[in-house]
A protein has these predicted regions:
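NAD(P)-dependent Rossmann-like dehydrogenase/reductase catalytic/cofactor-binding core
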Residues: 2, 214-278
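Short, well-ordered alpha-helices that flank and scaffold nucleotide-derived cofactor binding pockets
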Residues: 24, 28-32, 56, 91, ...
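Rossmann-like NAD(P)(H) cofactor-binding subdomain of soluble oxidoreductases
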Residues: 42, 48-49, 58, 66-142
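Internal alpha-helical scaffold of NAD(P)-dependent oxidoreductase catalytic cores
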Residues: 113-123, 139-177, 188-228, 268-274
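Glycine/serine-rich anion-binding loops at beta->alpha junctions
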Residues: 129-133, 178-187
Length: 278
């Protein structure tokens, strides 16, 4: 396996335009993974308090202006702003992005839209990460644009793979990944929240219930990842016929199944609307 000190990803300079939740999570994850030195990463955001906290934590360079961190012609530029303001950002920085590998994490903004805005010949890759990249347990989908090279794709896989797991796929599949995996942290947090409230209602103290459920969620995730056991098989293995888990699942599973399908459909519909508006 290639060590961080000799990998290509450890040598590249990276500009992250947007220091919100996801932009900060990527910067934090890349530095704490040991893959990228903090001196190779710059983050721009209009909110100085976000940037100061990030600089204090991991030591990356910061600036309130995107153009300032693009003056050094970074090897890779991550567009980490909301889809609704992406066009404004591109207008603001103009041709300063030219020559860099451009990575967009904006949901619903297609490669075709990005290519039209950035110009023919620009190397563009769409990546859909989720928030656990901040603790290097995230999941990211990678879809290359027309002029992105295989080396560009491999670089993105190495960078985002250091933040959890990363997979290359078509843009169509990336949209599905965004609707499922991209939204999944919120889904899982909702599950813990609702189970916590149910536990409180049944008599457990709030802090104790939340701690026990968070630990259980992490434990189940680790067991499934390590064993590669099918989730359905795992569920059946821990469910005794006629027991308490069986009774609980009888009530919960139909609601979760219907809700999950509707949630993914809603996320896909929203992504489609964003792409049309873009």
């Amino acid at each position: 396996m290639t060590s961080p000190s000799t990998s290509k990803a450890s040598q590249v300079t990276i500009a992250i335009l947007g220091g919100g939740s996801m932009g900060s999570a990527i910067a934090r994850g890349l530095v704490t993974s040991g893959l990228c030195p903090a001196s190779h990463i710059s983050v721009a955001d209009h909110n100085p308090s976000k940037l100061e906290a990030l600089r204090s934590e991991v030591g990356v360079a910061i600036s309130p202006k995107a153009k300032d961190i693009l003056e050094a012609s970074p090897d890779l530029c991550i567009l980490a702003v909301k889809p609704q303001v992406l066009n404004n950002l591109i207008d603001e920085v103009g041709d300063a992005l030219s020559g860099s590998l451009i990575v967009s994490i904006a949901a619903g903004v297609t490669l075709a839209t990005l290519q039209e805005a950035l110009g023919e010949g620009e190397r563009i890759v769409r990546v859909m990460p989720n928030l656990p990249v901040a603790v290097r347990q995230g999941a990211s989908a990678v879809a290359p644009g027309l002029w992105a090279t295989e080396n560009d794709v491999q670089l993105c896989l190495e960078l985002f793979g250091a933040l959890g797991s990363a997979a290359a796929m078509t843009e169509e599949r990336l949209e599905v990944e965004g609707a499922v995996v991209g939204c999944a942290p919120a889904f899982f947090a909702l599950l813990v929240d609702t189970l916590t409230r149910a536990a409180i209602d049944a008599g457990l103290p709030a802090a104790q219930a939340r701690d026990l459920l968070n630990t259980t969620m992490g434990g189940v995730s680790s067991m499934l990842s390590q064993s590669q056991e099918h989730p359905r098989a795992y569920m059946e293995r821990v469910t005794s016929p006629g027991g308490t888990t069986s009774a609980a699942l009888h009530e919960l599973e139909p609601l979760m199944a219907e809700g999950s399908f509707k949630a993914v459909e809603a996320a896909l519909a929203r992504a489609c609307k964003l792409s049309q508006n873009g």
